């Protein structure tokens, strides 16, 4: 039995919570992980948008925060090495998976329901992608780790998230 050993009532009571609210688009949740794919069909409507960068000039830091074209967040790994901030996809999509748990759009007939994904009317929490991990093939003789990130990347991500309105940071980190 898949439920053997599970404590009765140990769920999150999502149904009861959704009777009060299913999300709030004024709340920004930073996903500090690998990339959150901003075009994912179950996440796109709930992605945080840096309006100054979205409507600004490509290749320019339109909002003056030190990061160029950070429309949905920043790739802190790339920034550390080459100064660019473009979000890049990974093989595992862990950040996208985590973001779906938080705020996949509810009631849209796609995928699953996020805990704070809203009612399907654009009222879910906003997801900010703070990419702090990247994937290095295990065959790489220098690193032999997967995924990889640095304390510097994480610290920059927390600072960026706080400076740009995130009230919550999700850090689904671990190691073997």
Kindly label every feature range from the protein language model.
Residues 5-11, 93:
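Alpha-helix-centered segments that form part of catalytic cores
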Residues 1-4, 15-18, 159:
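Primarily auto-inhibitory N-terminal propeptides
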Residues 154:
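Aromatic/hydrophobic pocket-lining residues that form the small-molecule binding cavity
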Residues 158-176:
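Short acidic, glycine-rich surface-loop motifs adjacent to enzyme active sites
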Residues 15-151, 164-167:
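Subtilisin-like serine protease catalytic core
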Residues 2-7, 31, 72, 174:
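Extended interaction regions within the primary functional domain
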């Amino acid at each position: 039995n898949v439920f053997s050993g599970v404590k009765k009532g140990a769920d999150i009571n999502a149904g009861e919570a959704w009777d009060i609210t299913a999300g709030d688009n004024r709340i920004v949740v930073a996903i500090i992980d690998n990339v959150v794919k901003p075009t994912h069909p179950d996440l796109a409507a709930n992605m945080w948008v840096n309006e100054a960068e979205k409507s600004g000039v490509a290749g320019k830091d339109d909002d003056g925060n030190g990061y160029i074209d950070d429309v949905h967040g920043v790739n802190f790994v790339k920034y550390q090495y080459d100064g660019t901030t473009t979000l890049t996809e990974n093989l595992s999509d862990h950040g996208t998976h985590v973001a779906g748990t938080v705020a996949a759009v509810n009631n849209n007939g796609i995928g699953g329901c996020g805990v704070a994904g809203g009612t399907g009317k654009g009222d879910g929490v906003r997801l900010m992608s703070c990419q702090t991990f990247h994937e290095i093939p295990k065959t790489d003789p220098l690193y032999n780790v997967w995924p990889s990130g640095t304390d510097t990347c994480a610290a920059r991500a927390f600072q960026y998230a706080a400076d740009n309105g995130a009230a919550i940071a999700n850090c689904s980190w671990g190691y073997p």
